[in-house]
Amino acid sequence: MSIRAEEISALIKQQIENYQSEIEVSDVGTVIQVGDGIARAHGLDNVMAGELVEFANGVMGLAQNLEENNVGIIILGPYTEIREGDEVRRTGRIMQVPVGEELIGRVVNPLGQPVDGLGPIHTTKTRPIESPAPGVMDRKSVHEPLQTGIKAIDALVPIGRGQRELIIGDRQTGKTAVALDTILNQKDEDMICIYVAIGQKESTVRNVVETLRKHGALEYTIVVTASASQPAPLLYLAPYAGVSMGEEFMYNGKHVLVVYDDLSKQAAAYRELSLLLRRPPGREAYPGDVFYLHSRLLERAAKLSDAKGGGSLTALPFIETQAGDVSAYIPTNVISITDGQIFLQSDLFFSGVRPAIDAGTSVSRVGGSAQIKAMSKVSGTLRLDLASYRELEAFAQFGSDLDKATQAKLNRGARTVEVLKQGLHKPLRVEKQVMILYALTRGFLDDIPVADITRFEEEFYAWLDSNAADLLEEIRTTKKLADDDKFAAAINGFKKVFVASE
């Protein structure tokens, strides 16, 4: 049988044309050192900063330090199985988290994996955890109120949708309670809330979730938790995961509230990672870019322009101070980034003034333009009343001979402090806040004994619901003060039936 050269060459040509290369080109490096949640790898010359890499056992890592001879990687998972000499490969992707409606009502970790035992989350949408903040032209001035339901905040330091308002105070001063009450008050406000717990005890997070569930707030809330037992990389990533989940809603024209509880622990986790990566330490051993850590997170909160859908993302970051020292490094950084701060004083808290908001040092730089007209009219003199009361209170302890004007200021101040007190998880609708503050600032409470103010308030709200519902509805819909005569008639009508205690 003769074999013709033409046939052979034709067959070879055909084989070459039909040949499909199955070679996969990937950048592979070798682990040269591992420990404390950090790995160093050699050979990943083309890896990008912030890129995901995959270890041989399937655990992912984040390339952070790009050095001359090696790459510093933070490991996002258990690192005990990773050994020196193991293979590590580039993925070509940056870290993303699952987003979308499916996460609402769930408790997830910073990687978007459910930790509440309610099964998998079926969403196909993801967003990168690091994304640029909206530009100047994509934004709009803050002008819509975010009602917290807390009289002291809505009257003195109002918050608008799209604002960043810092909540700062020592441990055990009621910071989490302020945020929870704010979330509970969003029930019928068409808001999606995201509570990010950073470095909290798991029992604390459990209590928060149960509180939200009990009050029906979990149906519009996502809880992101990186508890104290988690490795530092997850604590560092948790706030970025939370804001990415919120951005998905904001860019679709919805309103979002994100609570970061608290950023001090995130900064400590980032300091730990930076020192392990051998980055040079600065003040208080924090790395040089710790300001950027928080600024790039909080700048992603915005009120979007109408062209971008008009959505908003409001941020409530927490900072824990040591012995009330707001001039430490992290507190001053975050104060300078945010649009105001609510300062919680431990002295006030332990003296029974709760929420323990210090009206003198708390400010809201942009919330005033978002406050409803009715509230700005009734709360105009509150800050001055409180400030003069605190000043005179110190003098009044030394002498009893006070003139009538001073005594009147002290009496009004004592009643103001009582009215601004509020029970735990009892947020108040804004129309009822306006009614009680009107009664306070216009002198209707001056003849009510201080000890009876709390009872007066509770009975007044119940009386308004049954006897002056139209007045409450008018404030709610017009957002303006009704006729003075209507207010006076309602308040005097209740005072006639109110019985002071002996």
Curated annotation (Swiss-Prot):
Positions bearing the site annotation: Required for activity: 362
Enzyme Commission no: 7.1.2.2
Membrane topology: Peripheral membrane protein
GO CC term (a single one): proton-transporting ATP synthase complex
Catalytic activity: ATP + H2O + 4 H(+)(in) = ADP + phosphate + 5 H(+)(out)
Keywords: ATP synthesis, ATP-binding, Cell membrane, CF(1), Hydrogen ion transport, Ion transport, Membrane, Nucleotide-binding, Translocase, Transport
Protein name: ATP synthase subunit alpha
Organism: Bacillus cytotoxicus (strain DSM 22905 / CIP 110041 / 391-98 / NVH 391-98)
Organism placement in taxonomy: Bacteria, Bacillati, Bacillota, Bacilli, Bacillales
